[in-house]
Amino acid sequence: MADNSSDYRALFLNDVPMMDARAPVEFSKGAFPGVINLPLMNDIERQKVGTCYKQHGQDAAIQLGHQLVCGQVKDERVEAWVEFARANPNGYLYCFRGGLRSQTVQRWLKDAGVDYPRILGGYKAMRTFLLDTLHEAVTECDLVVLGGMTGTGKTEVLTQLPNGLDLEGVANHRGSSFGKRATGQPAQIDFENRLAINLLKKRAAGIEQFVVEDESRLVGSCNVPLELHQAMQGCPVVWLEDSFEHRVERILADYVVNLCAEFISVKGEELGFGLFADRLLQSLNNIHKRLGGERHQRLLALMQTALEEQQRSGAVELHRGWIEGLLGEYYDPMYAYQREHKAARIEFAGNQFEVSGYLSERSSRR
């Protein structure tokens, strides 16, 4: 058996398999990518033991825990742990603080003939390590913000750069009012953990300058860490440009063709299209106050007609109507205003090819 470990850096850099012995309610609030939740106690059992601990102390709580997790219940859980351990011989187990729960799981595994290491300090210590990783990256590394009008393909540029930090990808959201995906967003803690691991791996590869897309503090329901967002407000900006026509086509592909395919892939043909249509309509409704009544109704009529035609024939051409209106009358004026306020920070502007080349060359200067 490997020794118990507190080398959190190595655990995350090497994507070491981990088994989380916390209760499901704890796991759902925040965990690490790829980790499997195989709890010692379920939520109800944990609550009972916690209440007992507060009222009668640790010894009584431990005794109650053994009474609740015994017999067939214990056998089934141990069997699941053994299966995980044998499938992941290089893995580790942990609980919240690396205390009694993970020690109990480790001991019961040993009784079943399996020696398996645990992570010292548990989830709490690993979470602290990742928060420190975020802080160190923000304070020690250079940042460049990639800005541009809606539909210029900022994410396309960002994801092709070795030093690109894709906040929207980590948040599973495109960042705009229309940005929700067919699958949900991670919990806030999961978002932060994934972001920190991303930074850790890139820095381990020698990257000390990061390019981030110009985002508001919220990417859907995920908050960009305050320290990172504040740093983004003062760093240099590179502005991506493209023609209105190209931007319309890119938005048509991303927010209509690809999003519809996403929903159908997840939910099936009939239900998927209905949910896709509802999502588009709701996204437009979410900004109806900012659009104003007349403009909202006009764009809504165009969107409804386009959706009806798409459902009838599969054709998506009519969607260009509301996309052109939304860009020209809403997003472009808003982004033009933002660009004006960032003008002093913009150090380069160009098309995708030019911006990609500039950012690649810039990253080699440090």
Curated annotation (Swiss-Prot):
Keywords: Selenium, Transferase. It catalyses: 5-methylaminomethyl-2-thiouridine(34) in tRNA + selenophosphate + (2E)-geranyl diphosphate + H2O + H(+) = 5-methylaminomethyl-2-selenouridine(34) in tRNA + (2E)-thiogeraniol + phosphate + diphosphate; 5-methylaminomethyl-2-thiouridine(34) in tRNA + (2E)-geranyl diphosphate = 5-methylaminomethyl-S-(2E)-geranyl-thiouridine(34) in tRNA + diphosphate; 5-methylaminomethyl-S-(2E)-geranyl-thiouridine(34) in tRNA + selenophosphate + H(+) = 5-methylaminomethyl-2-(Se-phospho)selenouridine(34) in tRNA + (2E)-thiogeraniol; 5-methylaminomethyl-2-(Se-phospho)selenouridine(34) in tRNA + H2O = 5-methylaminomethyl-2-selenouridine(34) in tRNA + phosphate. CDD domains: RHOD_YbbB. SMART domains: RHOD (SM00450). One of its GO terms (molecular function) is tRNA 2-selenouridine synthase activity. PROSITE patterns: RHODANESE_3. The active site is at residue 95. Disulfide bonds: none annotated. Its EC number is 2.9.1.3. It is an enzyme of class 2 (transferase). Residues 12-135 form the Rhodanese domain. GO terms for biological process: tRNA wobble uridine modification. Involved in the post-transcriptional modification of the uridine at the wobble position (U34) of tRNA(Lys), tRNA(Glu) and tRNA(Gln). Catalyzes the conversion of 2-thiouridine (S2U-RNA) to 2-selenouridine (Se2U-RNA). Acts in a two-step process involving geranylation of 2-thiouridine (S2U) to S-geranyl-2-thiouridine (geS2U) and subsequent selenation of the latter derivative to 2-selenouridine (Se2U) in the tRNA chain. Monomer. Belongs to the SelU family. This is tRNA 2-selenouridine synthase. It comes from Pseudomonas syringae pv. tomato (strain ATCC BAA-871 / DC3000). The gene is selU.
